[in-house]
Amino acid sequence: MVKINVICIGKIKDKYIRDGISEFSKRLSRYANLNIIELPEEDDNKGIRTAITKETERIIDALNKRNRSYSILLDLKGKLKSSEEMAEEIENISLQHSEINFIIGGSNGVDDELRKLVDFRLAFSSFTFPHQLMRLILMEQIYRWISITKNIKYHK
């Protein structure tokens, strides 16, 4: 069973998003060992650049504790893939790595240092989504990818 870490900045504030994440976490528990790692959000009153730097450092520290894992950054500048393509990608990654990290930066983004460090940068769309909502969208897609590879009747 593959271990999936969702490394993200901040806590979920809206109940409907928490409920959706909880539902997909429950569904995923049959197929993956899911771990959501919430890192503190930096107050940007000292400047956005400072906030981005500190949040990026926290993400890198979390990644450094997970050696031999494969890291995917959700990034507007990343590569677009279909659900089917990503399902195949995740299947291939899980054959070589027992642990996969999905990273969602804070509302101000991440440093280029992190972009260089990760194994893959994935764009979901050219649209901008709130980072908390993106966590729910990611959870749904992880479940969709697994449902595709396991032939679960979910993806149409």
PLM segments and residue spans:
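Conserved RecA-like P-loop NTPase ATPase core
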Residues: 6, 72, 105, 138
